[in-house]
């Protein structure tokens, strides 16, 4: 693809004039008339040259490649222009896509041919629309000057940080010099409407196939993606009473599908499991209790229930009691001695940590896992519940996770239920869900690693398909409470000047500490420094994290008091408590305190006191470890002389598995890989040493006189400086909050700490235990919760210790029914924790929905924590709710940097700063000292926080290979405020630039989009059904041709005009008369000087129109004057393109080609059904045709209310995709033919079977196999009503699995050999499972899988009066 780089005028690019006489050539003729159109797909490489000459159209440069948004406006979201821009530069646009430049995928294209391609267009601001030169202009401008980037600026508030939905999009621009055609001069106004966009994230949820139970007490929703696919038909009948009201219709539906899935055996021989992904507050506890009760009624009296805390045992008992299952006892494993298995029946309740418990008592090695297995027995078929199952994530890397897998493998027939609102936040965390049957024998993925690779390679779209496929297959259900009534807001908190001064001093002191630690390590000759630097950077991160939190305390207290004054109550979310430092100070002062403790100061002091390099530390390390041998081929380390004459900062991880647990028990961070031998030679201020001072020239002998004294003096000097700084550092956030909001008497604390510091009435400060008389510390949180719910206390502070399973909503059953205001002071570093905290105050049966307030400071370091949450939320929503935008609605997605774009942006930034390479992204505007100062300061700053590499021959620093986003964002916490904000801004500008590039090239994954949002006239023109391979049953995919009528009738336009009130709103007619008629439109003012335009042929134009452009080309008229041209244009555009309407002829039509310019009707192609099974095939075809394997997932709702979700197939790929599907279908049918052994004769003929008494029935007879068309049960009764899942669901309907007699009446030979083999398999499968033959077990009902069995023909008594065999 051609691309013209911008010419540069100092720091700003300018466009060069187009070559004189350049002409635009039409595309070569194609075979199918459908593929012809006057549009170009601008986002992918053509399969063959699109031009027949060397002359090329000139493309302007992009004007939005930086991260800064256009001025904030509030344009209503409209559909975007994915489709291919017309040759006249009429580029459809959409203001709703400033964050999501969706449609730039080739799979977001319209029906236009992929062969009609020109270079990627570039963009200019929307307010320049009236200046756009087109091929129809008489005098196109010779050149256009446009900035390559909108310059960045320092922090200016949250909304300015990333693009806003309410900002008008930039429009595509293309400057051409061709022979003018005056009669079509104004064709540029004909904006093509976009076919793809985002609509509502949620849809109201009502059980579609389960009709039992009473309505849920609150409104429940499902993501619109999951709501687009149906669940399987119900074949299981519950033994539970359905009319008692103890379980709602939603909960009974989940119980039904779980028990139905438990009737299925996977190809591995294990029983299939079920995932309950319901959000917090829907009632997962009662649902799980219902599954246990159902199995109890079926005779399975034992069950295992795993959760995160022993306290939740009381919630389990409450749930069983609420559903009237009082006869089921709950036994706490923690109260049972090792080796005791005397408990006979009931629920064994245990925590995940108990799974790895061991005991050596009595000289015998006992484990809890062995105890559980002994209690269950080898043939255990009861229920195993993994409640809050996200705690078992990382099963491949943690002992606890491996125990969860081991338990499932050793009890293969157990009925497993996974239950969690968060499920798995990343595909790799699904490893413990081995019973879902998504990977393994007989599935598209042989093992979990193959599944993981496929999903991560294909991005969020594949994750969304997984969720839909799981629901269709009957193994997954995910509903959540409606968020209607819930308000979200982000409170951006500016830093006080005094606080900023303290922060800057702390940053400088940490940079000095880095140098001091390095000097001390060099002086004593410390070799192994991995643990040292792990401790250093872990403490570094904690210290600045505490400062970030402390910056928000004052504002939070103000907000809390305001909300209390409005008769509301406040819930404050924290993650860490800082208790460890408090206990250290107590120990140092013999249990006495005279002031509040600073957690930040404690972290710094503890690091120096415990981990400062010393000879003792060297001896300890040397005695227990050996130096690793350098791998062959590695370069030599920095010379000893260099290391001795300057500080050597080794690039190391930010945390370590050996990190000090005493620093903060509530904090976690991920270990990073260590490159021991990467060194940066720095001087005392963190810069590369060129002029080394006298101190550095001293030869240091670790065993010589004075070395130990100098090291000790360095340590004491550093301690003194930290203590001086500590006088100004903020005190422990949790203690200060409780003190400011009224003390323990008015604040309910639900955290994991055992003591706190409080103010006494006389003004003194004292430490007190949280334990109360008659209560153990374990029960204090429950008592505090009761006080809050009763209204005794109106402020609650919760941490992770209380964020699972605790209900703090405005419940109708409690006294305190004030509206909850949930303030997140400290964003959890994990989305798992975030979702749990958000769900504490938004639950069923509440009087009012909560308000959420997220407090975020302007520190770049604070955004680091927000970015992690945003990443987890985005991925989480995609995987567990089928739609990543479900969690994006929590307003945190603006901070998502931890992805491939973040990695690329980071590499680009580091190479630019350290290696002095060129970067097209400008530095933040307004940085003191300008560009040279910016790069000098950033280089010094990066080195002062340990980010850098080896010095190359040209004097530049090589970029560290393994510097991750996490490390980068952790480390820049330690820069002065203005530096970290500038560096963070530069990073985010580069990040957005890379995303924009991918959007324009069609490589950006937008998730699931809506086809023709806001348009109701959508119809299915045709469908073709194909079989897809699977095990034990084959699936189906359906290829649809969709028609979209985007026109706007006069009646609808007139009704809309009646609601308009703006001074310039209303109908307009063009000054230019075309085809003896003026063009007509309806304009609606948005905000400022921009209007949304509606036209009779295309409906809402996604490009916003500027007021001056509107008034220059149109004049306002009354509705009566507009009616006739509107109706005429609407009728004519059904069959005639714009050229025919304007000029009474069309050049393309005269050449025998199809022209779609301005037509009302559009065609699209979709592939729906068992998409996971054909994903790889379709991606390969796409890559072959279009050089990109990205698949765009779309959804739509037709005129007759049918919903479809599937892969959008571009017009240019249709022929190849259909060819591949036909080959696949033929392969499946060939494989099925000998298995069925059931040839279809040309005419029905009776089958004479000996059936009298004493007659012998030859069950070994097998008629010869013949090719035959698929029997009726292979038809596709309803689109997407698929029961096809990976290895668990039959292809046909139950009616299709007829008995031999029924087949005989159909005139079809029976393969009795197959029937006999099926009988033998049933015999070898053993006796029916307990209760399986009871009501609702389904046909067959045996352990072999009931109605889901693999055999094509199920054996039943074939003759009247005959006895069932065996």
Swiss-Prot record:
Q: Does the keyword Magnesium apply?
A: no
One Gene Ontology term of the biological-process aspect is: bone mineralization
Keywords recorded for this protein, A-Z: Activator, Differentiation, Osteogenesis, Repressor, Transcription, Transcription regulation
Found, by tissue, as follows: Detected in macrophages. IL10 regulates expression in a STAT3-dependent way.
One Gene Ontology cellular component annotation?
Answer: nucleus
Report if keyword Transcription regulation is assigned. yes
The biased composition feature labelled Pro residues covers 15-24
InterPro entries registered for this protein in UniProt = P-loop_NTPase, SBNO_Helicase_C_dom, SNO, SNO_AAA
Q: Which domain of life is it from?
A: Eukaryota
Basic residues bias: start-end ranges: 614-637
Q: What induces it?
A: Up-regulated by interleukin IL6 and soluble interleukin receptor IL6R in astrocytes.
User: From start to end residue, where is composition biased (Gly residues)?
Assistant: 1333-1347
A single GO molecular function term of this UniProt record = histone binding
**Which portions of the chain have biased composition (kind: Acidic residues)?**
182-194
Region Disordered: start and end of each range?
A: 1-24, 174-217, 614-640, 1324-1366
This protein's assembly is summarised as: Interacts with TAL1; this interaction inhibits TAL1 occupancy of the DCSTAMP promoter, leading to the activation of the DCSTAMP promoter by the transcription factor MITF.
Q: Which family does it belong to?
A: Belongs to the SBNO family.
Q: What does this protein do?
A: Acts as a transcriptional coregulator, that can have both coactivator and corepressor functions. Inhibits the DCSTAMP-repressive activity of TAL1, hence enhancing the access of the transcription factor MITF to the DC-STAMP promoter in osteoclast. Plays a role in bone homeostasis; required as a positive regulator in TNFSF11//RANKL-mediated osteoclast fusion via a DCSTAMP-dependent pathway. May also be required in the regulation of osteoblast differentiation. Involved in the transcriptional corepression of NF-kappaB in macrophages. Plays a role as a regulator in the pro-inflammatory cascade.
Q: What is this protein called?
A: Protein strawberry notch homolog 2
Q: Which organism is it from?
A: Homo sapiens (Human)
